[in-house]
């Protein structure tokens, strides 16, 4: 847990929002988009979830606008986190321009996600933050992608 707070502090996310995400039974699009948008410097740490969603949509990192309180399936959590680093995927990742399905499979193959996890499952905020820090540990030797 200390590693989570330390790594997230590097990206200046609001402690209040991080606490809220940690206590979420099921993480939402707004929460995940906030993490991704603040990590890339697209929004300030006091930005709303709606602003984070909008900026990721405007930057082409999301295909559509979603409702901030809509639960996000794990496959889309991994896809949004993949926007932070240049994850070297296999052939299908490259052929599909890093489609969410193949990014999810790549993270499983890399050992970032447990093999028992289902792509359509909803995960807690605690799990999403743990996944975020695992990605940071695994892929974090690279610079963050900022477009």
Regions found by a protein language model. Name each.
Residues 60-62:
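Primarily EF-hand calcium-binding motifs
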Residues 12-34, 38-46, 64-147:
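Terminal recognition/anchoring or ligand-binding modules at protein termini
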